[in-house]
Amino acid sequence: MESDENTNSYTTEEDAEYAVLLDRREQLTDLLAESPYNLIHYLQRAVVHSNLGYPDLAAGDAYRALLLTDEVRNEGFEYHDQAVDALEPYSSSPSALPEVLRHGALQQGSGDMVNGHGPQGPESYQEIAAVASVRCYQIISLSLLLCGCLSSAHTYCERGLAASPHNQELLNTRSHILTVGRGRLQTQDVDVGRLPEWGHVRREVYPWNHHEPDRFSGKSLSFLNRELASMAPKCEVRVSELPVLLDSASNTDDYEIIPTCHQLGVFAKEDIAPGETVLNEYSLLTANNRLKDQLCDACGTELPPLSAGAGPVSCDDCQDTVFCDQFCHDKAQELYHPAVCEKDVDAIAKDPDAAESSASLHLLLLARLLAMSVHQEVHPLQLTNVKYIWGDFIPPRTNAISVSPNAGPPPDWTLPFSFKYNVETPLHILEKMDIDIYQTLPQHDLWVLNTCLAKFRGTASARQSIRDGRPDVAAVHPFWCLANHDCNPNVTWEWGGRMRLWARERKVVGDQPGGIKAGEEILNHYCDTDLPVQKRREWAEGSLGGWCMCKRCRDEIAQNGLDGSATNGVNGAAPDGVDGVDGTDAVDGMDGVDDSSTEPMDWAPHSKKKDVVMTDSDVLLRD
């Protein structure tokens, strides 16, 4: 396929190179399955990932290699013997380093390494480990720079320079980090403590991801409808035709015919009366970022008082883990808790700073999913909790970086990424769970974790604390998120241990009677429907992956112009808390949620002001 000025697709020549790189990646992944403690294979795969245009995956591989250099250099470490044995094929000739280490000045060996970072003994594997550690720092720091994670990039660059102060590649990378930092901080005098930590990476179904189902197939729809029957007996999952989302304001708002795409949706099989429950969904894929808070570990609801008849129920083996009732206790023991019982993971990512509340919840949702996967012995992406969720993925070719001189601008990568929250801490959690992060690479490779996080960001709802307004409890309800968004919804929702959808008593637009007729689609809402159209679109952009193109939004834009900020389109009034009412703007720091987060929060408020959608629902595709 030829590229042109408006695409980032590969040229025919690049297609061939891309195919070779994908084949090499597969070979190295197979080699890692055979020799999971081989740090050289990790570095080789990091280089391939970098050449494929996945700097985040390159950083993840180099980090695992860096951990293995520590295993080699320290006899008391858990995997020392395995890591040393894996280097045996490279140790026959002390003067010959593996090709991946002969990079720039590193081909001269460890001669300029200082501060105790050189070889820890005369063995040839010690020389390899010492040189490899610097190569790891090179790859990690440059890759994180390319992801936009300047703070971590600077940290690992400085660690590399502490070991090899004159390494030119590290010196160049540090210079580039500071240059980019000046642009992002808009100052010539860069305070490295203020360098941003969050960047963005590719959000896609990776070419080697064979776990993603055909969501529109008869088999998938049959499974989903069997599961849905007990939660929403009057509904069914079907394929829905939806407007394609745009990235910004467009004159297509007033077109009668607009581009559409297909996604899953929920439809009424029977008439549903106003106020009638549409869906009642229970989920164990929950997270709580408050340490020792009085919440059920399983469903996230508040614990009943000790005097209650059923009362809270504790785990017999770890008394600190408490459930709201016997049902939640039994479900937790069946589906996830034994994987974390007495494993000292409770305090990780708890009681975060305000700026990290959102990130901690996404991380803890990932931790819960990993516990489910480990206990059930099922690959994380095969768990039904996430398998059929769409993660607002963008086709790999759209994400591709073309080297053609006629190529357009670089693509906009859309998955928020932090080295701490996407790489370091997930691996730390797995180690706390007594999981061998090398042997279980197929289940816990970084691309797997990224895919899970993309799906969470597409479906998670959260509850704000009544104490400080921060999000402190989150959950993924995979069937609730199948109900597509509309700014004139026919249902509303509340989450309190279970996610409940019910038919609205009155419609938002025109104050028409509520209720849903058989055959009509269930239309959910991921933003405050009282907001004017521009505010709604800004809120829902994080939830939907683009600007809402529902009929109400397009009608109001056509009526009010592209800014669409005059009224809420329902009664002509500015809603409470908007445009300076009460001295605040509803979009900034929503109801006490700290808006200074360095991680993109992308949360949309529920009308009850305590439940929020965390981001990117299973809805419309970006144009």
How would you describe each model-predicted region?
Residues 1-623:
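Short alpha-helical interaction motifs and adjacent low-complexity tails used for partner binding
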